[in-house]
């Protein structure tokens, strides 16, 4: 007799599965109904450990994915076999009194019906979808309303929805012209729809749920403002044309006089601020002052600090290993900082006619202006001026007339003295 087969050590698969479930139930006793994250995490870890042992979670997920792929491959293989060999289709049976034309032919589905128009069953494959039973628990209109969102609406559609949704409720409310802010926020944020409910009380909200005539949404206002913005070039041209012809030409003398005046104004302002802060400090009003201001307001503190300071002196020693790096020092040449007049040869100046004829926005005109050529607004190039002879003499350019008596001899002397005594620290 052949030897008996040895019994499996672990028993059948069902027995092993029952053992694992029993172990999981014992270890997680009283924790299944707990909703805490820690308890659920512990239950998941215990289940994974009992079922798969010490396997890596990635390996487990990979094995499950492989099983799923095998099932899909089997289904595809079965479908291919059915298409190739076309298994025998059982004869159709219908209940008494039923119309055969309301049932799709099973042989026609498999492509095996040879009766054609004589077949008593229907050959319309869309018949099943048309005759599908409607569930008494589902309203098809709800699905249509869910798909009909505010993103696809225009103004007319929005008014129609508002009237249908809030029309009857608006009639029962007390008369008020104030629009509900929740309603406006929902429309502005594209949250309004068929299922929107007012947080201020639903249909019992006392404010209006309708847009007043002519109301413009904020998002539409932003679009209009962006369209009304002008370019930087147009803004510069408008501001330049608004100056007019009666302006002072900027020369070296006028610029230096303006600079001197501004510097003096700055010094006067600083002195006034210092006097005011000093008065506040003496009166005890200044709460926040710097250490420098304290010694400026009370110079006697400097001597007190010197008397109380330590008499220890520190001498900086030089080690023998240190190398004396001789660095060349150059004196400052003040002549390099003397302002000089800019050479005006080759500089194009716009004529006074530009204020009467506004420059066109054509690209060709802008290109000619940038290159210094002929333009419609009255600008002239150096070649035209040289050929005409009337616009430029000896490198000087005709522009706005300058008052020669603007600076007297005394002003020029003061200016020269200031340049000679120029302090570089300023």
Curated annotation (Swiss-Prot):
Expression across tissues: Ubiquitously expressed.
Modified residues (Phosphoserine): 231, 351, 360, 381
Subcellular location, principal: cytoplasm
Region (Disordered): 1-30, 53-74, 302-326, 359-426
Annotated stretches, region: Required for interaction with DRG1: 236-260
Chain ranges passing through the membrane: none
Superkingdom assignment: Eukaryota
Induction of the gene: By NGF in neuronal cells.
Zinc finger (C3H1-type): 99-126, 174-212
Biological role stated in the UniProt entry: Protects DRG1 from proteolytic degradation. Stimulates DRG1 GTPase activity likely by increasing the affinity for the potassium ions.
Name of the protein described by the UniProt record: Zinc finger CCCH domain-containing protein 15
Organism: Rattus norvegicus (Rat)
